[in-house]
A protein has these predicted regions:
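Conserved alpha-helical substructure of the radical SAM core
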Residues: 1-116, 120-121
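Short, flexible, mixed-charge acidic loops at enzyme active sites
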Residues: 26-27, 130, 211-215
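Conserved radical SAM core fold
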Residues: 33-35, 72-76, 107-112, 124-145, ...
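Hydrophobic/aromatic residues located in beta-strands of well-ordered beta-sheets
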Residues: 67, 101-103, 125, 166-168, ...
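Glycine-enriched alpha-helix->loop->beta-strand junction motifs that scaffold or abut catalytic
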Residues: 119-125, 191-194
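A conserved non-catalytic segment of reverse transcriptases
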Residues: 125-126, 152-156
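Radical SAM enzyme [4Fe-4S]-AdoMet core and its adjacent flexible, acidic
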Residues: 142-150, 157, 161-240
Length: 240
């Protein structure tokens, strides 16, 4: 009797633009990585794209496959790159496989062409937004330090116009942590968002803060944030 476990489905997240981004969120841990890859060497080539799509589809044991794009900011790769990625999926799709395309973006470059493409191919688009204007603009700023709220709202309107499925990705940070109800009502009532996801911006616990990490949310003035412990060096969040 063969007791070997059956192969399990797995999920991969691709960052075709590497760490390159067109905004400068002050809580982002990833922007400094650009210095490691000069001369655009972090950008995914057409050859690498084809190899990636082929291997992703070929190695999946199950019928459900997610092709997920993130960044940096993936729209910097231009729309034609993702048109080609969809064509490659169709080229290498195995019999019985079903593909879900997902795409995480700050929204600044979205327009009618992008959103028509997303709708045509059934993309689930994650749009990064931290709440109403004053909360969003506290950290999600451009390279000049100017808030990006108006540009993200424009992206939301393009997505809504084309009836694209959208998941709002909101970080929980020092600007909005005490305004959960306001944030939720903004997304639910003003935007009419159907899918919401919240990710805390947290700080690793050091030896000096271990007791506080074990305690969880601190009631000490100025320390009302969650610390965490970890093994290894796989998590790279930065606190604000």
């Amino acid at each position: 009797m063969n007791s070997a476990a059956a192969p399990r489905d797995f999920h991969l997240l691709a960052k075709p633009s590497g760490s390159t981004c067109n905004i400068d969120c002050t809580y982002c841990f990833f922007l400094s990585k650009e210095a490691l890859y000069p001369n655009d060497r972090s950008r995914m080539s057409q050859a690498t794209l084809e190899t990636y799509i082929f291997q992703l589809l070929e190695s999946q044991p199950g019928a459900e496959v997610v092709v997920a794009w993130q960044g940096g900011e993936p729209t910097l790769m231009k729309l034609e790159f993702f048109r080609h990625s969809v064509a490659l999926v169709q080229k290498y799709l195995k019999p019985g496989q079903r593909v879900q395309h997902t795409f995480q973006t700050n929204g600044l470059l979205l327009d009618d062409d992008w959103c028509a493409f997303f709708k045509q191919h059934g993309f689930l688009v994650g749009l990064s937004m931290d709440g109403p204007r004053e909360m969003h603009d506290a950290y999600r700023v451009d390279r000049r330090g100017k808030g990006t709220f108006d540009l993200v709202m424009r992206a939301w309107q393009f997505l809504a116009k084309h009836e694209v499925d959208v998941n709002i990705l909101c970080t929980v940070n020092a600007a909005n942590e005490h305004h959960g109800r306001d944030v939720y009502r903004f997304f639910r009532d003003e935007l009419g968002a159907k899918w919401l996801q919240f990710i805390p911006i947290v700080e690793r616990a050091s030896a000096d803060t271990l007791a506080l990490a074990n305690q969880g949310w601190s009631e000490t003035p100025g320390r009302k944030r969650l610390l965490y412990t970890q093994e290894g060096h796989l998590v790279t969040e930065r606190s604000v």
